[in-house]
């Protein structure tokens, strides 16, 4: 409780992200946190219809990542930093666990206190 929740993923399909974020919402994790940091979610958009890796999910039948964020996370009206470049990209930004931080939503940065 009262912590900053950081979420990021790589290569996950939008319907799975929707399911996972909805599970967090139902567990009241978004309500209980003080703020949310969302990483870049690299390669997490639906593949084209002709993509051989398509597992049968019709691309037009799923929400986009932006729609999922707007419908599942933003209604909580928590301070939310979107597209924070950390973890799975270069340059890599380290987010220390348990550290006290402040979110600067205007400059899109995290300040260690």
Describe the residue ranges of each PLM region.
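Conserved mixed alpha/beta catalytic, RNA-binding, or beta-rich assembly cores of soluble enzyme
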Residues: 2-23
